[in-house]
Amino acid sequence: MASAPAGVSRAFWSLVTSESLGELTILDVGTGTGRVGWALAPLARHVIAVDRDAGAIDEARRRAAAAGLVNVECVVGDVETSEYTAFGPDLITAHLCMSDAIVERAARALVPGRVFAFVAFHTDQWRETGRPSRFAYDEARARRVLTAAGFAVEHLEVEQEVQRFASVEEALAAAIGLAERWKSDGRWFHYVRFLEEGGRTLTRSHLIVKARRT
């Protein structure tokens, strides 16, 4: 079995690759530069990678060409507003790109028995900022949304890593890459206040899910 690409959950990878992929068309929604899709391409019949960021899709095309992948297709599209049915997917993946709209579109595109596997932000992601992402799910909400859309949840787990810091300076340095985004939405202020009040952690928390269309 091929190993998970760098930065991709091994649990998620195992859930996807435990399926017989050889004759399947895989749709990777919110693909970015194709990290997950291109790693799956050698295992599948065809991979379609969709993202609304045209620059990311251009980079995905370059990476596919450099890797010599001939069974892949790149599409610029908004995965929250476009339908997936025309792609004819047999399996759908989403890595840190998740919303109720994506679940609903995946359900409409997959025939019974086919799999939707994803990694989503968990509501504990960066909990120290005092503001969960609007794209974050807890376990109960994920099950509820999937069941309502017509999926049976086969696997659901939370992967969590809590970084611990010796000082405020160390904690701020670890989050510096997020500073601009957090300053724009108020999360930076809350994180700094958390540190000033004695907090010394930063939590990464992801939800790993495999669901099958009923």
Task: Please name every model-derived segment.
Residues 90-103:
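A short SAM/SAH-binding and catalytic strip from SAM-dependent methyltransferases
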Residues 80-91:
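A short acidic, Gly/Pro-enriched loop at the edge of an enzyme's catalytic core
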Residues 35-81:
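Class I SAM-dependent methyltransferase SAM/SAH-binding core
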Residues 3-24:
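Conserved alpha-helix/loop element of class I SAM-dependent methyltransferases that forms part
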Residues 102-115:
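A short glycine-rich, Lys/Arg-flanked "PGG" loop and its adjoining helix->strand segment in the class I
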Residues 157-214:
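Conserved Class I S-adenosyl-L-methionine
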Residues 24-30, 115-141:
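Conserved class I S-adenosyl-L-methionine
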